[in-house]
Regions:
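Bacterial N-terminal signal peptides
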Residues: 4-16
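Sec/Tat signal peptide C-region and signal peptidase I cleavage site
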Residues: 17-23
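A short glycine-rich, His/Asp/Glu-containing loop-to-beta-strand
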Residues: 24-56, 114
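Glycine- and acidic-residue-biased ligand/ion/polar-headgroup-sensing regions
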Residues: 60-79, 89
Length: 128
């Protein structure tokens, strides 16, 4: 029974942390995953969104900060107006807030996202 629960838990963790990987037009490459600060883990990804690509609504159990390398990121963030971030601009997503990133442009969107999230929790969870 415990083995089954461990397997199910692992599947749920993998599914929740691969929110981007399951969506058409979005590619994610993990650059770094490291424990720290205490009780947290730091994850750095580079993401590429094809024109028209859009994430599912989701949350993170910690802070997300990012930097747009190419294109324009349109970000819907719970409690804030929708904002477009162009190449060379940085953005921040509050812990636990529902948000959606999208590429409304005609060119590739590429950005770096750094998460500092609670250890042993999924890095990303679909929002209700």
């Amino acid at each position: 029974m415990l083995a089954r629960l461990a397997i199910i838990g692992g599947i749920l963790f993998i599914g929740a942390t691969s929110t981007y990987a399951q969506q058409a037009g979005i590619e994610r490459k993990m650059l770094l995953q490291k424990e720290g600060p205490p009780g947290y883990q730091t994850i750095v990804n580079v993401l590429e969104f094809a024109p028209g690509a859009r994430e599912v609504r989701h949350t993170h159990p910690g802070a997300l900060s990012g930097y747009v390398l190419e294109g324009t990121l349109t970000l819907e963030h719970e409690g804030r107006p929708t904002t477009a971030y162009k190449a060379g601009e940085a953005f921040y997503v509050d812990p636990g807030k529902i948000h959606v990133g999208m590429n409304d442009g005609a060119a590739l969107l590429k950005f770096i996202a750094t998460l500092v999230v609670e250890k042993d929790k999924p890095a990303s969870s679909p929002a209700p």
